[in-house]
C-alpha cells in the first residue's frame, strides 16, 4: 500500500487516524477498536468488513 495513501486515509466511523499492521494486512483504528482489511493492496473501508480488535490488540501500543 502506498504510504501517501495512509497519510490521507481516516477511519470511516470516527475520522481518526489509522495504523497499518506490520504484515500490511489491516488498517487499525484504536479509537473504535476496529481492523479494516487490506486486500491486494486496497483498503476495504467498510464497517461491515471490519473486525473488532480483541482485548490484547486493544492494549497493544
UniProtKB/Swiss-Prot annotation:
Pfam families membership: Trm112p
This protein's name: UPF0434 protein Avin_14770
Cellular component GO terms, alphabetical: cytosol
Record SUPFAM superfamilies: Trm112p-like
Coiled coil: none
Family: Belongs to the UPF0434 family.
Organism: Azotobacter vinelandii (strain DJ / ATCC BAA-1303)
Gene3D superfamilies: 2.20.25.10
